[in-house]
Amino acid sequence: MRRTLYRLMIELTNGRFTSYILRKFAQSRFSSIIIPSYAKVFQINQDEMEKDLKEYRTLHELFTRKLKEGKRMIHAEAAAVVSPVDGIFADFGPIEESKTFDIKGKRYSIVDMLGNEERASRYAGGTYVVIYLSPSHYHRIHSPLSGTVTERFELGGKSYPVNAAGMKYGKEPLSKNYRSVTEVDSEGKRMALVKVGAMFVNSIELLHKRNTVQKGEEMAYFTFGSTVVLLFEKGMIEAVSTLTSGQELRVGEKIATRLTS
């Protein structure tokens, strides 16, 4: 019953018109009125921001803010795979040979997440990593490793929240929400960077358009808090064993080690 009521409320409020109005407001000068309150409520670290709080003209500018030079260091170890975002580590684990994985008591299909069987088959037996971004986090997305971009594509339409309630009651938000996917070949192994849209504001702006990418390079940004799912091919990485659910991560922090072929 709770799941049914939750989904009904989301469907009634999560239409294109509602999303359009909220997006237009966030991009308007009127939204600047609530910036101080927003920064206070979500405890945004203003010392790291590239500009002073009063210099942001809209909520959108604050959401997509850059940081001061040197505030995020990319792990220098050649074999290190790094966090692509500032966020809260949710989980990591094996992708079953059936091309599924379980998180928070819900089973997710890689076929659904990536749109077809051919793409999903590459990751059977591999590893997944999930990182959640709250509205307070820095919203820019960086590459976790170096390699060659093999494909970019978008899937999905409406988006359920990706908070605790959304993960519990939503329609498999990680594989059904609007999502923007970048696949990267790194030394003969494939990784998928799945950027999952949040409720109301689906916008994910791609910044990286070249064929090659360097570890730590900026790739995209969310316009609001959301989630990143990383999928790694079998035998590609070994996740850092000390990672724990709820742990804060920063861009450039080591989350896994590349395994040698």
Curated annotation (Swiss-Prot):
EC number: 4.1.1.65
Known pathway: Phospholipid metabolism; phosphatidylethanolamine biosynthesis; phosphatidylethanolamine from CDP-diacylglycerol: step 2/2
Site (Cleavage (non-hydrolytic)): 225-226
Predominant location category: membrane
Keyword Lipid biosynthesis: yes
Keywords assigned by UniProt, alphabetized: Cell membrane, Decarboxylase, Lipid biosynthesis, Lipid metabolism, Lyase, Membrane, Phospholipid biosynthesis, Phospholipid metabolism, Pyruvate, Zymogen
Membrane topology, record value: Peripheral membrane protein
Reactions accelerated catalytically: a 1,2-diacyl-sn-glycero-3-phospho-L-serine + H(+) = a 1,2-diacyl-sn-glycero-3-phosphoethanolamine + CO2
GO cellular component terms attached to this protein's record: plasma membrane
Membrane-spanning ranges: none
Cofactor: record remark: Binds 1 pyruvoyl group covalently per subunit.
Subcellular localization(s) per the UniProt record: Cell membrane
Cofactor(s) demanded: pyruvate
Domain of life per record: Bacteria
Known function: Catalyzes the formation of phosphatidylethanolamine (PtdEtn) from phosphatidylserine (PtdSer).
Record family assignment: Belongs to the phosphatidylserine decarboxylase family. PSD-B subfamily. Prokaryotic type I sub-subfamily.
HAMAP family: PS_decarb_PSD_B_type1 (MF_00662)
Protein name as it appears in the record: Phosphatidylserine decarboxylase proenzyme
Gene it is expressed from: psd
